[in-house]
A protein has these predicted regions:
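Active-site entrance/lid segments in N-terminal catalytic domains of soluble metabolic enzymes
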Residues: 1-221
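Repeat-solenoid scaffold signature
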Residues: 216-238
């Protein structure tokens, strides 16, 4: 392999969750039932949130309002699919849906569409979204960063999670655009076809480890998105 070719190949070993185990350590907790997994976060926009830091994916048949209504009882979040209408949101909010744990999701949409969507829900119910998710297959494009920057001006009080990226450079790009949380993961989802169709991807555990310092230095949270095939993978992600 020539030096010119070698610059495109990483010599570092990259790991998925299935490549590792957690080494047992001493604990004063006598039962797994005694473990408290709730956390409190204060994002860089000043918004504080408390609950179980697990988010049901915004996939069509997972990120539903019905799922959100069930999971909120355990303070678990749901990124609600972008295909859900504002009217459906309004109906469920009036039935007790808590927007502290249910997050509207958008793609690379027009900024005015997003603000109109959120305002319609707020004006109709008196409840405002606390967190929104911006989700695209490739979070490295300029237009995505521009959308984030525009929204941070238009809706500064709303916490924004955005992605997906898998490298420190991607985390820094989105952090500089103004996000409060970065969604990490490309090609690692159990039903994701991105790696198969495009050849693009990154082993999920290494993505988390490689990006952690950059996220901390930029005061954003990392959200591991994908790669979970067994319940034990949750512990590895944390």
């Amino acid at each position: 392999m020539t030096r010119e070719q070698n610059k495109f190949i990483s010599n570092e070993r990259k790991l998925a969750f299935s490549d590792v185990y957690l080494v047992p350590q001493f604990s004063s907790i006598n039962s797994r039932r005694s473990v408290n997994v709730t956390e409190e976060f204060t994002f860089k926009n000043g918004h504080s949130w408390e609950g179980t830091p697990i988010i049901a994916s915004n996939m069509d048949y997972i990120g539903t309002l019905e799922m959100a209504s069930s999971l909120q009882n355990f303070k678990i979040c749901t990124a609600v699919s972008k295909f859900v209408s504002p009217e459906d949101w309004i109906s469920h909010i009036e039935s007790g849906l808590d927007m502290e744990y249910a997050f509207p999701t958008f793609g690379l949409d027009n900024k005015n569409y997003i603000t109109d969507y959120l305002n319609h829900i707020s004006d109709s119910t008196g409840h405002t979204a606390k967190i929104i998710v911006l989700d695209v297959p490739n979070g490295y494009i300029d237009s995505f960063a521009s959308l984030i920057s525009d929204l941070k001006v238009l809706i500064p009080d709303i916490t924004i999670f955005a992605g997906n990226v898998v490298t420190p450079e991607g985390v820094e790009l989105l952090a500089n655009a103004g996000v409060d949380g970065v969604k990490l993961g490309i090609g690692s989802g159990s039903v994701c076809t991105t790696s198969i169709e495009t050849g693009v991807g990154y082993p999920q555990l290494s993505a988390i480890l490689d990006c952690a310092d950059t996220a901390k230095n930029n005061n954003v949270v990392l959200i591991s998105d994908g790669g979970i095939s067994e319940s034990g993978d949750l512990g590895k992600a944390f």
